[in-house]
């Protein structure tokens, strides 16, 4: 196998970040740097003990990329930050893997699309709930019904509350 893929992770202390770290490890890629606004010294030491740089901002991660050429930045930050962070990565030709939603409005999604169209990089999003037990069961129930049965479309709402300490202060 050739060179390992190099990743940066933005929002390293967030709820979903450990799953991204696990996925990066599962494909034998290198997590080169992580960033979060709220690192304490113990958290920094833990990452540093694994030869993972700890950074305080996306801007620092961009500088890291300029010297170490990251293949991807994985964005695990609060939703309202995604659009500007994605665009910054695209402007620096860094591929982005971003938690859903990519954007909070159609106009923001259009901004992302426009930025991607002039960038050498691409944006990828995550829809991990397709493997959630409840979703799998729903799909099985839908596909097991006879084809001549009428189907009713109903709105489904899934709420996952994050711990208070994961929100910016």
List each model region and its residues.
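N-terminal Rossmann-like dinucleotide-binding module
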Residues: 1-50
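Local beta-strand N-terminus motif with an aromatic residue
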Residues: 31, 70-73, 150
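Beta-loop-alpha module in the N-terminal Rossmann-like domain of NAD(P)-dependent dehydrogenases
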Residues: 53-113
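Short strand-turn motif at the edge of the Rossmann-like AdoMet-binding core
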Residues: 100-101, 127-129
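Rossmann-fold dehydrogenase core element
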Residues: 111-128, 151
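Oxidoreductase and adenylate-handling cofactor-binding alpha/beta cores
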Residues: 131-154
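Conserved small/polar residues in nucleotide/adenosyl-binding loops
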Residues: 159-166
């Amino acid at each position: 196998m050739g060179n390992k893929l190099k990743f940066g992770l933005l929002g390293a202390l967030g709820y979903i970040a450990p799953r991204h770290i696990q996925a990066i490890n599962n494909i034998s890629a290198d997590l080169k740097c992580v960033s979060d606004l709220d690192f304490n010294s113990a958290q920094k030491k833990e990452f540093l003990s694994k030869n993972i740089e700890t950074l305080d901002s996306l801007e620092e991660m961009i500088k890291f990329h300029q010297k170490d050429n990251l293949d991807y930045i994985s964005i695990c930050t609060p939703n309202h930050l995604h659009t500007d962070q994605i665009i910054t990565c695209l402007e620096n030709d860094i591929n982005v893997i971003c938690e859903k939603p990519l954007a909070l409005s159609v106009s923001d999604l259009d901004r992302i699309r426009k930025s991607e169209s002039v960038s050498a990089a691409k944006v990828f999003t995550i829809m991990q709930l397709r493997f959630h037990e409840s979703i799998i069961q729903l799909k099985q129930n839908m596909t097991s019904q006879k084809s001549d049965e009428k189907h009713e479309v109903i709105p489904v709402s899934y709420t996952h509350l994050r711990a208070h300490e994961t929100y910016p202060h």
